[in-house]
Amino acid sequence: MSRPEPTGENRIVEPEEIFFSTTDAKGVIEKANSVFVDISRYSWDDLIGAPHNIIRHPMMPGAAFLAMWTTIKTGEPFCAYVHNLAADGATYTVLATVVPLGEGYLSVRVT
């Protein structure tokens, strides 16, 4: 699957649109809720089994994700604002909190 190009559209995520995903230890998506599917514009089939960086926006610096992985691998939670890229090229910005969960991670996103 090819990555979309940013279109310049900014999608607003409403406060009640709380969404989550769980991943394995390598960041491969195992579960997600329907809000994540709706906002990301990816289908269930595209998301489940894909690396979580499928939604990575090219304007996000790699250092942000290095800081996240360094933190969560120690068992600590990580929280940051993240610009994501939907399948249709729209940008959406969320406050992401990532915490260790079993052998993987849970990420909850809000605005």
Go through each PLM region and give its residues.
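Sensory/regulatory domains in signal-transduction proteins
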Residues: 2-111
